[in-house]
Amino acid sequence: MKLLLDSHAFLWWLAEDPRLSAGARQAVADPAATVFVSAATIWELSIKAALGRLDLGGADLVEEIAGNDFVELPVKARHSLAAAYLPRHHGDPFDRMLIAQAQIEGLTLVSRDAALRAYEIQILPA
């Protein structure tokens, strides 16, 4: 299975937070799974940390990706174009990027955001 972690799913995984569903935890831990973290997610979390809205506890998110055997997913031009032309069911630009990436790359998005269900993507509840 190829998974793309939404920002909250990524943070919950790192913190071993019980809010991450058992199904999501099992899927991410599966050695056969390839787990992606978007560069857009790192950008989003870094912005929130810089604004004082998120405490990363000194975590180096890039090191956390590698340390958990996740794969960094770059934002490509085709992702950007697809995100721009998605239906306006969801207004958050970071979530729209993840939707576009999931569609183009054939990934299952791990998220608890109910608004994402309006799009034609596979979702694993976080």
Model-derived features: positions:
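Residue-level signal for well-ordered alpha-helical positions
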Residues: 16-17, 48, 86, 122
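Active-site neighborhoods of divalent-metal-dependent phosphate/nucleic-acid chemistry enzymes
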Residues: 53-58, 62, 66-115, 121-126
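Short, well-structured N-terminal submotif of metal-dependent ribonuclease cores
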Residues: 1-37, 50-63, 105, 114-118
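Phosphate/NTP-binding elements of NTP-utilizing enzymes
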Residues: 45
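Short glycine/serine/threonine-enriched helix-capping/active-site loop
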Residues: 37-38, 75
